[in-house]
Amino acid sequence: MPKRVLTGTVVSDKTDKTVVVLVERKVKHPLYGKIIRLSKKYHAHDEQNAYHEGETVRIEECAPISKLKSWRVLEKADKASAA
């Protein structure tokens, strides 16, 4: 099974080797049809502490690293789109 890859914004980089990434998605309400923005925060592993608050990054699902971390940062999202 392929690993899930999500794109989001780093909202916290205060912990060592960890960043908190906010991922937003839009869904349509099943009854009323209104488009709703839903968001979720993921703790992602950042080995070199290379990513900082406000940056847009891509994260990939991985084996659990700790109680909260089962994602790791792949790269900056703007760098990925330029390549």
UniProtKB/Swiss-Prot annotation:
Keyword set includes Ribonucleoprotein: yes
UniProt keyword list: Ribonucleoprotein, Ribosomal protein, RNA-binding, rRNA-binding
Gene3D superfamilies referenced in this protein's UniProt entry, alphabetically: Nucleic acid-binding proteins
Gene Ontology molecular function: rRNA binding; structural constituent of ribosome
An example Gene Ontology CC term for this record: cytosolic small ribosomal subunit
Superkingdom assignment: Bacteria
CDD domains for the chain: Ribosomal_uS17
Gene Ontology biological-process entries: translation
Keyword RNA-binding belongs to the record: yes
Subunit structure: Part of the 30S ribosomal subunit.
HAMAP family linked: Ribosomal_uS17_B
NCBIfam families: PRK05610.1, uS17_bact
Family from the record: Belongs to the universal ribosomal protein uS17 family.
Job description of the protein: One of the primary rRNA binding proteins, it binds specifically to the 5'-end of 16S ribosomal RNA.
Full protein name: Small ribosomal subunit protein uS17
Classification of source organism: Bacteria, Pseudomonadati, Pseudomonadota, Alphaproteobacteria, Sphingomonadales
